[in-house]
Amino acid sequence: MYFIQEGVDVVEEVYTAPFASLGPIITQAASGTYRDLAKWTGISLDDTPCKKTGNANPRFPIYLKSYNTTAQAQVYELFKQATTSTSTPFSNALFMFEGYSQQGVKAFNKDATAFAYRGDNLLAAPLLTYTPNGTALDKVASDLGNKIRQILYTGSGETSLHTYVNYAFGDEKATGWYGSEAWRQKRLQSLKGKYDPKSKFSFYAPIA
């Protein structure tokens, strides 16, 4: 768990004290600049999730408005069982729960721009790192990741899946990446046509 606060050398206790009271096994403190963030959080170019190691690193992200404790407990048990058995290929998997300051995001009306998920507060994403070993294992990973996400989705009470396009597994559809409202899709497609008329940047999860 990372607590990162801008403009101070030590994160204020009002944020850390409730978690420190739980008696963590270890805590580490550091101070630096914005450029240190990737290193602190394990996503620099030298860290495993971002290196070309031959591993598969599928994520299954979902935006949430709040945590559903029942769903969280179910996901915890499923993830624990899948990653801790002696024969599991997913022993290097991890689970990201991301929450950021929302003041700037929510300063705009949710319909002011084509970005769809201003009302969401959290991003959850299991990262199932494993060594590829055929399509059967790929399916196991896909089934596991989607099952985890489905539990969180069901617990959210939402009627459409909200996903973070940069983490997306790839089977979510454009409505999950960019919002289910037709006008958002049309606006993004219009901008795509305006700024990239020759589709030079139509690689992963394209809007058009």
Describe each model-derived feature in a short phrase.
Residues 1-208:
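Soluble FAD-dependent oxygen oxidases
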